[in-house]
């Protein structure tokens, strides 16, 4: 006997798609202390940003690195990040822990990154001694409270 189901399933491909990408974002933004100790804070930060769709420019380099193969290899203190650029990147507040230990970061450009919130801006205080410029463009989750953190930079 054949039974035909007349009810629609509650399964939505769109919901599954979002859950899948949210799960990846959690993994991609996770701070790995052991990895930072192995390769140094600058390379670990560069790997995080590239993995999430951002790019970095190293001190005394003219171009941005936006792919793993363009991140320079070498001693952990040899290549220092000078500029971060994230446009439509999937970076989250948790990933901003990668800023810890960056001593030469001068500029941060964040644009249309939907998952950046006020606490992300608060974590920028880790680089306040070297930071000269921060550009925040079209960040929907940043409120006046988040902007207030900039006063401390």
Q: At which residue positions do the language-model features occur?
A:
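Short, intrinsically disordered, charge-balanced linker/junction segments flanking boundaries
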Residues: 147-153
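LRR N-terminal entry segment and analogous cap-like coil->beta motifs
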Residues: 21-37, 43-127, 132, 136-137
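Leucine-rich repeat domain C-terminal region
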Residues: 13-14, 131-132, 140
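N-terminal mitochondrial targeting presequence
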Residues: 1-32
């Amino acid at each position: 006997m054949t039974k035909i189901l007349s009810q629609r399933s509650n399964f939505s491909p769109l919901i599954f798609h979002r859950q899948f990408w949210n799960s990846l974002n959690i993994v991609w933004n996770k701070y790995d202390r052991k990895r930072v100790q192995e390769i140094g804070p600058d390379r670990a930060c560069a790997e995080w940003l590239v993995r999430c769709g951002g790019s970095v420019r190293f001190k005394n380099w003219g171009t941005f690195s936006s792919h793993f193969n363009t991140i320079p290899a070498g001693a952990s203190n040899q290549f220092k990040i000078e500029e971060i650029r994230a446009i439509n990147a999937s970076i989250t507040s948790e990933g901003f822990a990668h800023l810890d230990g960056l001593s030469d970061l001068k500029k941060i450009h964040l644009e249309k990154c939907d998952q950046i919130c006020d606490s992300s801006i608060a974590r920028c205080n880790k680089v306040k001694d070297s930071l000269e410029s921060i550009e925040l463009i079209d960040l929907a989750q940043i409120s006046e409270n988040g902007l207030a953190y900039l006063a401390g930079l």
